[in-house]
Each structure stands twice: as structure tokens, then as C-alpha cells.
Amino acid sequence: VQTYFFRRKNINAAGNARSWTDHLLWHHAAHTVDLFAYQCGEDISECYGVQGPIHPQLGIAMDMGIVCKVPSGSILTLSLSFNNDGPLGSFFRYICDNGTYKAFYDDLSDGKDNKIDVSKVDVSMDGIELEDREFIAAIKEKREPNASLAELLPCMHVLGKLESIVDPQRKAHA
């Protein structure tokens, strides 16, 4: 998976200043590491990571590489960078045994740039609406919602282990 942005200032996608600093590991890698474990249906058994230098003003690493493995043998190789000099926004490339997929916001294409229609995948293209629908349904059905805090904890443990590898002194949080 490639997760690439261009970031030199502490601003959001709309160009507005943030009161917090974005982070490759604790924000962007979290999405992919969690998705990988979810899709595999297994907890991550091995992980390793490296990061580049800490940006002097932002106080975060601008580049990172992560490898994870589950007991059945599937692996995740994740490359993250805030040094991608491209349009505002992000793109994601997913490579698997079922093909190559590129996502940019709500657009999805295959590895040859053929658009994939995702408009009929769910009742809405709005991710926030879908999260809200799932949460309300879980309350009505008296069940744990998909993507609950409990389901996220294994991912947080993996990220903690990765942080201890790439930033053992927690310099990026000083």
C-alpha cells in the first residue's frame, strides 16, 4: 500500500490551520494496519518499521515504511510519505493477489487506470453517513458496532510496537 501526501505546513485538506499535527504512524498507518488485519481476519503477529528524519518545524517523520504479517502468511508492505509533491489530497495504491487498486477520495480504479464504479457498493457514498448508520443499527440491535473501540485495540498495540521500533525515545512527540 502507498499512502502519499504533500505536507509542509500544519494545515488540513481545505488549507485551514490545525491545532494538532498529522502523523504518519498514528493516523495514516493506523487506517491501513487496521484494514489489513480486518481483511485477513487475524491479528498481526509480526511487524517492523523504519522512519526518516524528523521535520524540524512539524516535529514528525516525513517518510515511513512498515511491514506486517499475520499467522496465515499474508503480509502488508506499507509506504507512507508527506514528501509526495502532487495535488492536495492523497492517493492510495493497494496491491493484492486479486489485482491492483488505486483510490483517490471517492474514486477507485484498477492498476491500468480503468475506473471502477463503486456507487452501488452501499446505500451511500458518504463514509460518515455509513458509520452513523452502522452505529445506530448496532444500538438498535444491541450488538457491538463494526469498527468499535474494542476491535481497534489490537491495531493500537501494533502501532505501539512499531513506535518503539522507529522512535524508541519518542522524539517525534517531544
Question: What do these predicted regions represent?
Answer:
Residues 1, 41-45, 75, 99, ...:
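Generic structural signal for secondary-structure transition and capping sites
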Residues 1-50, 54-56:
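Predominantly a Rossmann-like dinucleotide-binding segment in NAD(P)-dependent oxidoreductases
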Residues 22-23, 119-122, 143-145:
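Active-site rim elements
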Residues 28-31, 130-131, 150, 154:
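A generic structural signal for residues located within well-ordered alpha-helices
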Residues 32-33, 129-136, 159:
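A general structural signal for well-ordered alpha-helical segments in protein cores
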Residues 51, 56-61, 71-133:
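NAD(P)-dinucleotide binding in Rossmann-like oxidoreductases
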Residues 66-68:
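Short beta-strand scaffold segments in enzyme catalytic cores
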Residues 71, 135-174:
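C-terminal helix-rich "cap/oligomerization" subdomain common to oxidoreductases
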